[in-house]
Amino acid sequence: MPSLDPIPTTLSDHCRQLGLVHTAEALNDLIARATQKRWSPAVLLEQLMQAELAARLHQRVERRLTDARLGRYKALADFEWSWPTQIHRPTVDRVFTLDFLAQRENVIIVAPHGLGKTMLAKNLVHQAILAGHSARLLTAADLILDLTSQDTARALHRRLRTYLRPSLLAID
């Protein structure tokens, strides 16, 4: 006969068994605060759920940032807008609203080597993730190498689907 998990004995254990890990961690502090501030049970439950949702959102963003493979990059705030003079700031600002994602349009950044295309792409991926979108960055060389290394048409099709999954795929 298969063994059953031990029966939870505390409220924190119940939370963990239900998958509410962050609630289990915050439970004692929030109960103490609720007692001190004389919260109603509904307010306490709302605070617990807000803490759980906030922690899950933070975890989701962190996971997406890791999956995006951004590496190190210069923040957009540090970009030197006066050089190159050819860059059209209003266009870049419009791209960073991410409206093109909802419209399912493409953005292509074309410029000579060393003018900040990669930095803009990394910041765009970062911005998309913070806005709740899935996003990934990779080089064109890595993409081609990966796709050409697939042994069968089925494997290639499966790999293509992984690249089509994110809302934003930035190819440098």
Task: Give a label for each model feature.
Residues R104-V107, L124-Q127, A131-Q150:
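Conserved post-Walker A coupling segment in P-loop NTPases
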Residues M1-D13:
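Intrinsically disordered, low-complexity and often Lys/Arg-enriched segments
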Residues T85-P90, R136-L164:
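Short glycine-rich substrate-engagement loop in P-loop NTPases that contacts/grips substrate
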Residues R104-L120:
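Walker A/P-loop nucleotide-binding motif
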Residues K74-F96:
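N-terminal pre-Walker A segment at the start of P-loop NTPase domains
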